From Swiss-Prot:
The chain crosses the membrane at residues 4-24, 34-54, 65-85, 97-117. The gene is fluC. Fluoride-specific ion channel. Important for reducing fluoride concentration in the cell, thus reducing its toxicity. It is found in: Cell inner membrane. It catalyses: fluoride(in) = fluoride(out). Na(+) binds at residues 77, 80. PANTHER family: FLUORIDE EXPORT PROTEIN 1-RELATED (PTHR28259:SF1). Na(+) is not transported, but it plays an essential structural role and its presence is essential for fluoride channel function. This is Fluoride-specific ion channel FluC.
Length: 127
């Protein structure tokens, strides 16, 4: 039960942070640029970097299981959003933005994987 509480708190914090980040990114980029889900893209790439970092860092410093759950399953799980990526992609398709759709899906997956690798590398650099 203790693990569920850590995940619950981390997830809530991650969700609120995602919401605020998406608003900030969308206010700065979306009106001026072509129809691209910048906020969702940003949180998913940042979240991928963070989860790579948290996993690597927690292994390196032997963080408690509960703290690992809080950071990865909770915070990163709440911060990132695959469902919104899928919904944004569908909106691009329905809007006839086929090129942007293809680019968005491809670059989200590619940069997400690269961000996890980069985060893992950064986590290993701490001494």
């Amino acid at each position: 039960m203790k693990e569920i509480i850590y995940i619950f708190i981390g997830g809530g914090m991650g969700s609120v942070t995602r919401y605020l980040t998406q608003i900030a990114v969308n206010e700065r980029l979306s009106p001026a640029l072509f129809p691209f889900p910048w906020g969702t893209f940003a949180v998913n790439i940042i979240g991928s970097l963070l989860i790579g970092f948290f996993y690597s860092f927690s292994e390196r410093f032997n963080l408690s299981f509960e703290l690992r759950l809080f950071l990865t399953v909770g915070f990163c799980g709440g911060f990132t959003t695959f469902s919104t990526l899928a919904n944004d992609s569908l909106s691009l398709l329905k809007g006839g933005f086929y090129g942007i759709f293809t680019f968005y899906v491809f670059i989200s997956i590619l940069l997400g994987l690269l961000a996890v690798l980069a985060g893992g590398y950064l986590g290993e650099q701490f001494k």
